[in-house]
């Protein structure tokens, strides 16, 4: 009797462990295969694996997670520019440029919010269009700086722009996979 219970316990534990390993492997496989369609594989895998929703997400869910990362980036950049830079600047031209840049990042966040709605509606063409718009708004900010003689594009804004561009690139790659 005792040996039957031990055998049953061992079979149950073995089955449970193999199920957990299989589920983890399947999650890793879906993230990795999804990220292979992007231009930023390592970044994509790292970002998705760090989100607790990823293990249960399908490809569309992974796209939504990355869009959320982009919305956070764009919103925090808009707030950073508006709060940290604009508030301390006395130069009216620079202040106006920073306000314009803050608005562009807010528009990028709005475009990404629309992308979430497009994903829910499975309107992937519109989702792609909104992601491209979100990716382009920071370029407008950089161009505003270029047009004003003597203004240097701040390093932190440049870094955040590159980050948003990378995030949007990942989302675009995932959207391409959804269209296939």
UniProtKB/Swiss-Prot annotation:
Signal peptide region: 1-23
Pfam families tied to this protein: PMEI
Residues carrying a glycan: 26, 73, 84
Disulfide bridge partners, by residue number: 35-44, 101-141
GO-annotated molecular function: enzyme inhibitor activity
Domain of life of the organism encoding this protein: Eukaryota
Gene Ontology CC annotation, any one: vacuole
Location relative to the cell: Vacuole
Entry keyword annotation includes Disulfide bond: yes
Expressing tissues: Mostly expressed at low levels in seedlings, stems, leaves and flowers (in all organs), and, to a lower extent, in roots and siliques.
Keywords: Disulfide bond, Glycoprotein, Signal, Vacuole
GO biological process: negative regulation of catalytic activity
Family matches, as PANTHER family: OS01G0111000 PROTEIN (PTHR35357:SF8), OS02G0537100 PROTEIN (PTHR35357)
Entry's family note: Belongs to the PMEI family.
Function in brief: Inhibits fructosidases from both cell wall (cell wall invertase CWI) and vacuoles (vacuolar invertase VI).
This protein's name: Cell wall / vacuolar inhibitor of fructosidase 2
Lineage, uppermost ranks: Eukaryota, Viridiplantae, Streptophyta, Embryophyta, Tracheophyta
Name of the encoding gene: C/VIF2
């Amino acid at each position: 009797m005792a040996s039957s219970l031990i055998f049953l316990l061992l079979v149950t534990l073995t089955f449970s462990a193999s199920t957990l390993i299989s589920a983890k492997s399947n999650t890793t496989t879906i993230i990795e295969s999804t990220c292979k369609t992007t231009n930023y594989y390592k970044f994509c895998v790292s970002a998705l694996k760090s989100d607790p929703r990823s293990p249960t997400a399908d490809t569309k869910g992974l796209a939504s997670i990355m869009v959320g990362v982009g919305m956070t980036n764009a919103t925090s950049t808009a707030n950073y520019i508006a709060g940290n830079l604009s508030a301390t600047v006395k130069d009216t031209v620079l202040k106006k440029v920073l306000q314009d840049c803050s608005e562009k990042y807010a528009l990028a966040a709005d475009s990404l919010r629309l992308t979430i709605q497009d994903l829910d509606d499975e309107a992937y063409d519109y989702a792609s269009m909104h992601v491209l718009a979100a990716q382009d708004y920071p370029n407008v900010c950089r161009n505003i700086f270029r047009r004003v003689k003597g203004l240097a594009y701040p390093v932190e804004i440049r870094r955040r722009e590159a980050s948003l561009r990378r995030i949007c690139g990942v989302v675009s790659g995932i959207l391409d996979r959804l269209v296939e």
